[in-house]
Amino acid sequence: MTSFSLTFTSPLLPSSSTKPKRSVLVAAAQTTAPAESTASVDADRLEPRVELKDGFFILKEKFRKGINPQEKVKIEREPMKLFMENGIEELAKKSMEELDSEKSSKDDIDVRLKWLGLFHRRKHQYGKFMMRLKLPNGVTTSAQTRYLASVIRKYGEDGCADVTTRQNWQIRGVVLPDVPEILKGLASVGLTSLQSGMDNVRNPVGNPIAGIDPEEIVDTRPYTNLLSQFITANSQGNPDFTNLPRKWNVCVVGTHDLYEHPHINDLAYMPANKDGRFGFNLLVGGFFSPKRCEEAIPLDAWVPADDVLPLCKAVLEAYRDLGTRGNRQKTRMMWLIDELGVEGFRTEVEKRMPNGKLERGSSEDLVNKQWERRDYFGVNPQKQEGLSFVGLHVPVGRLQADDMDELARLADTYGSGELRLTVEQNIIIPNVETSKTEALLQEPFLKNRFSPEPSILMKGLVACTGSQFCGQAIIETKLRALKVTEEVERLVSVPRPIRMHWTGCPNTCGQVQVADIGFMGCLTRGEEGKPVEGADVYVGGRIGSDSHIGEIYKKGVRVTELVPLVAEILIKEFGAVPREREENED
């Protein structure tokens, strides 16, 4: 079993003399478990389903009946051995035809390489891979950005990068023979792609303006860095958590704005005081899937800041040990919570804490429920006197190599050589001397696509990869999202920012359920009765302290008919005014 530990100093308690001055206490009901929190569970059900063997956790023989195909692949060969025992070196020497000729190596390509952050695009880009990184809190450097640009540049039209909805980079066009050198290159600039896909902990999310935010509750960077280092054992691979039943998301909240979207994470740390100590209340179980979407619920538990890591470890161990491994649509952590009951799940977590104890939730939440979410675009003052951060719009999160090089240059020229990625697929340049902001705004790069002042509908636009690169996507998303939004903006004037999210399939990587208006790709019938690209339209998703998952507004809308429908929704639900009427009134 991996031996790994880190310690750090807890932040100062927020007090009457420290920021944020606008924080208020919220009701205790938000941090205590609901009444229906217990379930009748047979003692045999609490037997761990995995065991440690040869340094890795594997599913016990007695629990293998009815398991899903992915679990069988994991049993046949531990995926992390491709990295930890240099299996990737051997794979990289073979042609795709050779690899496809044997089941074991074909499973390596299509399944196990995801543990190294490599996703084969068999359907649309045979032999090409998407590589997902680990980028805790979305913080990256100009050197890292330049290196990634150098990687994708060599792949021509197939090479590009995306900012993801978890503050992360994904690069495209990668071919297998290049992977060993790319992994070395990533390590040389302080990056890793390990344990970023499949049944692993995904990128830890935090406040994108952590440490520079004048109104932050706590700087989330020490916590997200700690979590990422623990999960990957300092980028060496942590076999304790490479065999989860399904993917698992975590975030640390540091702001009243809830940029971190805690309600859709498996584990969310919510800042709270208790008896004069700073720490976190815990939300658990939030997730999206094709068959079910759930908001995270209170665990009725609080941990001091120093126990962020032990708590994460305990939750992961409970999920790893007890989670079901049958139908993949029923293996996310909330299904286990349903089965055990909130209190039963809490007990299992408590058992796995270092001292076997877990404090009850605190009523002293530090997140202000009445807070109006701030916009981070444009020039904004930092908590550090004389410095500002500048938020830039990245249309649907897509960048080319030249774009990344230019961002790196701007970060070096005007800032501190650092960039911040956001869950809305945008980028922030921090630590800009306020005296230099005007010169930055005059840069040609900011005059076109990467504007610090995007239009009111563009600024809230998010889109997944879509069918251009993803084999699971039913429709093209990124270009269509831009086109539909441009056409809608010509039809109506909107009084406030509206968040519109696009996802190409029911896996909802584009997180349509949290959007004001969401579009989920589907096939529908055309005028001649033949299948055509369409979208199920969602309305009513909310983020922030009154977070809520949106609901279906209309199913199976042809993509060619979306523009008038969106304009209609904006007028009926969001106070938009037709452009023609606005011009007449003017």
From Swiss-Prot:
Task: Tell me the keywords, alphabetical order.
Answer: 4Fe-4S, Chloroplast, Electron transport, Heme, Iron, Iron-sulfur, Isopeptide bond, Metal-binding, Nitrate assimilation, Oxidoreductase, Plastid, Repeat, Transit peptide, Transport, Ubl conjugation
Which E.C. number(s) belong to this protein? 1.7.7.1
Give the note describing cofactor binding and stoichiometry.
Binds 1 siroheme per subunit.
**Linked residues for Glycyl lysine isopeptide (Lys-Gly) (interchain with G-Cter in ubiquitin):** K103
What is the protein's major site of localization?
Answer: plastid
Q: Which Pfam families match?
A: NIR_SIR (PF01077), NIR_SIR_ferr (PF03460)
Q: Which GO terms describe its biological process?
A: nitrate assimilation; response to nitrate
| Catalyzed chemical reaction(s) | 6 oxidized [2Fe-2S]-[ferredoxin] + NH4(+) + 2 H2O = nitrite + 6 reduced [2Fe-2S]-[ferredoxin] + 8 H(+)
The entry marks the following residues as binding siroheme, namely C509
User: Which residue windows are coiled coil?
Assistant: none
InterPro entries in UniProt: NIR_SIR_4Fe-4S (IPR051329), NiRdtase/SiRdtase_haem-b_fer (IPR005117), Nit/Sulf_reduc_fer-like_dom_sf (IPR036136), NO2/SO3_Rdtase_4Fe4S_dom (IPR006067), NO2/SO3_Rdtase_4Fe4S_sf (IPR045854), NO2/SO3_Rdtase_FeS/sirohaem_BS (IPR006066)
Query: What residues span the transit peptide?
Result: 1-25
User: Which PROSITE patterns does UniProt cross-reference here?
Assistant: NIR_SIR (PS00365)
Query: Could you say which protein family the record assigns here?
Result: Belongs to the nitrite and sulfite reductase 4Fe-4S domain family.
Q: What is this protein called?
A: Ferredoxin--nitrite reductase, chloroplastic
Which organism does this record belong to?
Arabidopsis thaliana (Mouse-ear cress)
The gene is NIR1
